[in-house]
C-alpha cells in the first residue's frame, strides 16, 4: 500500500481554527482500542474531514484513501480553460495532511463490506474501520445522455473534473477557427457547482473576444433559471454583447442526445453542430458510493442532515457533492464545511455525546472577466 503526503486548499485551512476551538468540547473517552476512522476521497470534503478528525482528537487512527497522488482543484479551473491560469496552479500534493499523522493510502477503494467494516483496495489490501466517511465526489452519469460515454469525452470534453479534460477543452478552443461555434450543454439539477457553466461561458467569451472575435457561444440549458442569473446576463450584455446566446429548458434547450463523430448536439427542438462541444452530462455520486450501497435510486446518497450518517449503511457517513444535503449547493466550500461538521459528529458519537445541528455555509465565487486586462 503506497503512502503519500498532502497539502490542503484554502477552504480547509480557514476551518482549522474553528476545529481546534471545538476540540476541548468534543474529545471522546476512548476505550482500549484506538478508533479507526477511514475517509474515502481526497477532495475538499474528505481532506477537511480527515484533518479535522486529527485536530479534534490526535489519538484517532485516521486513514485517507485517495488514488491520485496529486489533487487537481475544480475552483478556478475555468480560468485555465480561458488561458488566464495554468493547470499547475490548481494542483496540490498530499504532504501536509499526512504530516499531521494521517495515513494516506494511494489506492482506489474497490469494495466496502459494511457488515465486516472492511474496505478492499485495488492492490488487494483490506483495511478495517470503526467509522467510514465517503467523500467520493461525482461521476458522470453517462447512461442518462444517449451518445455520450467515456470515449465521447475525448471529442466532447465535459471538463467537470479538473485535469486532462480541462486542458483538452482549452486546446480545442485554441485550435478552433475564428467564427466557430462553441456549444456548452448544461444538465438539470442536481449538479456540481451550479453557477460554473455560466462562469465558463463568460470566460470563454473573454478569450474569444480577444483572440477569435467572430466566434459565438451557445448555451443549451436543461433549466429555465439558475443561480446568479441576472448578474451573469448583465455581465454578458455589457462585456460580450451578441456573443453568448442561451436557450433555456422551456425554449427547447434540453440536450437529448449527442453524436461525437459529427459534434452534433440534439435538443428537444433542434440540432446544432459545434466547432467545440463542451458537454456537461448529468451527474451522480462517485462510483464507490454505489458499490458500497450508500447511493439510492437517484444516484445520490441520502444522509442524516445533522450527523451526515448514511441512511442506507451503518457506521458510514457521506459528505460533499455525493450527499443529498438539502439546499446546500454542491461546491468546494460546502464540502469542506460538511467535512468539518462530520468530523465533529463522529468524535461526539465516539464520546457518547449528542451532536447539535451544524451551521453550514456554501459559496460559489464566479468570474465573468479577469480583474486586469490579459495580455
Regions from the PLM with identified roles:
Residues 1-20:
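N-terminal secretory signal peptides and thylakoid transit peptides that target proteins
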Residues 16, 136-137, 186, 269, ...:
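Glycine-rich, N-terminal phosphate-binding loop of Rossmann-like dinucleotide-binding domains
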Residues 27-31:
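Sec/Tat signal peptide C-region and signal peptidase I cleavage site
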Residues 32-103, 188-230:
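Beta1-alpha1 glycine-rich phosphate/pyrophosphate-binding loop at the start
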Residues 100-111, 127, 206-299, 354:
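A Rossmann-like FAD-binding core segment of flavoenzymes
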Residues 136-211:
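Glycine-rich dinucleotide-binding loop and its adjacent helix/turn
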Residues 150-178, 272-337, 348:
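FAD-site-proximal beta/loop scaffold in flavoenzymes
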Residues 346-375:
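C-terminal, flexible cofactor-proximal segment of oxidoreductases
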Amino acid at each position: 500500500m503506497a503512502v503519500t503526503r498532502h497539502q490542503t486548499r484554502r477552504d480547509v485551512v480557514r476551518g482549522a481554527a474553528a476545529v481546534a476551538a471545538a476540540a476541548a468540547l468534543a474529545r471522546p473517552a476512548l476505550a482500549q482500542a484506538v478508533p479507526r476512522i477511514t475517509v474515502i476521497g481526497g477532495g475538499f470534503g474528505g481532506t477537511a474531514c480527515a484533518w479535522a478528525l486529527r485536530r479534534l482528537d490526535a489519538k484517532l487512527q485516521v486513514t485517507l484513501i485517495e488514488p491520485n497522488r496529486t489533487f487537481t482543484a475544480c475552483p478556478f479551473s475555468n480560468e485555465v480553460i480561458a488561458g488566464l491560469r495554468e493547470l499547475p496552479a490548481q494542483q496540490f500534493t498530499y504532504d501536509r495532511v499526512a504530516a499531521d499523522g494521517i495515513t494516506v493510502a494511494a489506492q482506489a477503494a474497490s469494495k466496502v463490506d459494511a457488515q465486516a467494516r472492511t474496505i478492499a483496495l485495488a492492490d488487494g489490501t483490506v483495511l478495517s474501520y470503526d467509522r467510514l466517511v465517503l467523500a467520493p465526489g461525482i461521476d458522470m452519469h453517462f447512461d442518462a445522455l444517449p451518445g455520450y460515454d467515456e470515449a465521447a469525452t475525448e471529442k466532447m470534453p465535459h471538463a467537470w473534473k479538473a485535469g486532462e479534460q480541462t486542458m483538452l477543452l482549452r486546446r480545442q478552443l485554441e485550435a478552433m477557427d475564428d467564427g466557430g461555434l462553441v456549444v456548452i450543454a448544461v444538465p438539470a439539477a442536481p449538479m456540481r457547482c451550479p453557477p460554473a457553466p455560466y462562469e465558463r461561458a463568460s470566460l470563454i467569451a473573454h478569450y474569444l473576444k480577444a483572440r477569435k472575435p467572430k466566434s459565438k457561444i451557445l448555451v443549451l440549458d436543461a433549466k429555465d433559471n439558475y443561480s446568479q442569473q441576472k448578474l451573469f446576463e448583465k455581465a454578458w450584455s455589457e462585456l460580450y454583447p451578441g456573443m453568448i446566446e442561451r436557450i433555456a429548458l422551456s425554449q427547447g434547450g434540453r440536450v437529448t442526445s449527442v453524436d461525437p463523430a459529427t459534434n452534433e448536439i440534439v435538443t428537444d427542438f433542434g440540432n446544432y453542430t459545434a466547432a467545440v462541444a463542451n458537454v456537461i452530462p448529468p451527474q451522480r455520486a462517485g462510483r464507490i458510493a454505489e458499490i458500497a450501497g450508500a447511493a439510492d435510486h437517484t444516484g445520490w446518497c441520502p444522509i442524516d442532515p445533522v450527523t451526515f450518517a448514511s441512511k442506507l449503511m451503518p457506521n458510514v457517513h457521506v459528505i460533499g457533492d455525493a450527499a443529498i444535503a438539502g439546499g446546500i449547493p454542491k461546491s468546494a466550500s460546502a464540502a469542506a464545511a460538511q467535512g468539518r461538521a462530520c468530523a465533529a459528529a463522529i468524535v461526539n458519537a465516539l464520546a457518547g455525546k449528542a451532536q447539535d445541528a451544524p451551521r453550514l455555509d456554501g459559496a460559489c465565487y464566479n468570474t465573468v472577466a479577469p480583474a486586469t486586462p490579459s495580455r
